[in-house]
Amino acid sequence: MSSDDERDEKELSLTSPEVVTKYKSAAEIVNKALQVVLAECKPKAKIVDICEKGDSFIKEQTASMYKNSKKKIERGVAFPTCISVNNTVGHFSPLASDESVLEDGDMVKIDMGCHIDGFIALVGHTHVLQEGPLSGRKADVIAAANTAADVALRLVRPGKKNTDVTEAIQKVAAAYDCKIVEGVLSHQLKQHVIDGNKVVLSVSSPETTVDEVEFEENEVYAIDIVASTGDGKPKLLDEKQTTIYKKDESVNYQLKMKASRFIISEIKQNFPRMPFTARSLEEKRARLGLVECVNHGHLQPYPVLYEKPGDFVAQIKFTVLLMPNGSDRITSHTLQELPKKTIEDPEIKGWLALGIKKKKGGGKKKKAQKAGEKGEASTEAEPMDASSNAQE
């Protein structure tokens, strides 16, 4: 690597304070957007309206940033707002004509993302439309996803491997008599790259394999935990429900249909690198052109998958910066009240007891107290209590 390449790499990594600021600014916006969307999740609310509200909020908030920058800075939605209910695994972000509404008692998964200058913050959260504390299998599956996310946060650290996380989250889900859903991938994030080459599998299988890799300092990951009360093997029911796509920049196939060429030109101009929703395209032409674009690899679809009717699926997704002083989780939201459950498994208890931040070396107790008086955050995270469902 040349010295220029090394400098460019450094300027785009967490060693640059400006990069850290952009990640955290994107996270602040998407965390607020999640609150806005949650407030709209009520019985009889139209799902497409909620999705539109989430995306609009992110666009409005990011539009006011870096307006006076000398170079044009891309910013906005990094992943369209999705509202996936009950046994729907994810990626449900319907077209404007869709009449789907939320109902009382629905388990709602919200998935969304924001970026500033291509530095991406993603978040996923699960909420049940009911008053008071949760119970039964709905509570179990949310607790399973949340505890698995807490364990993943402690294992996505320099020196650990992606396979360590895959094995651990499955063990956690089993403690709640739930399954981690197959086919869900957690990716390293880089500037303008939502699906980096370092990948954590939700479930390893002969059909789905990735290279074993080690986490390293100054990397960023979006960790996506999806748990189910069912068998964790979701199915595609209707290809027409797919509305989220991402352009594959490596494909150069010459499209035949005029509608396809029009659509791909529009996508290149408006969504060159981030996933987008077909709602953002001219609907009639999109219907005609998207099929050829997908068939020839120009677009990567994000399909809407389902577990069996009666199953419940919960998601917790977060973005984490692997800083020199430890892991910094920058996206989250507080869960509803869950019943306490004691985890007996010593290995899971051990994972939950791991700190997230590194201890400061050579610091004396007095100095630590002084820092505390000034309101500085402790550099050693509180270990999780394995006897309760600690909430985000």
Curated annotation (Swiss-Prot):
Cellular localisation: Nucleus
Q: Tell me a GO biological process for this protein.
A: rRNA processing
- Which keywords does UniProt give here? Auxin signaling pathway, Developmental protein, Nucleus, Ribonucleoprotein, RNA-binding, rRNA processing
Q: Does the keyword Phosphoprotein apply?
A: no
**Which parts of the sequence are annotated with region: RNA-binding?**
48-56
One of the record's GO cellular component terms: ribonucleoprotein complex
Task: Summarize induction of expression.
Answer: Cell-cycle regulated expression with accumulation during the G1-to-S phase. Accumulates in response to auxin. Expression levels correlate with genes involved in ribosome biogenesis and function.
Entry protein name: ERBB-3 BINDING PROTEIN 1
Q: Which organism is it from?
A: Arabidopsis thaliana (Mouse-ear cress)
Lineage, highest ranks first: Eukaryota, Viridiplantae, Streptophyta, Embryophyta, Tracheophyta
Primary gene name: EBP1
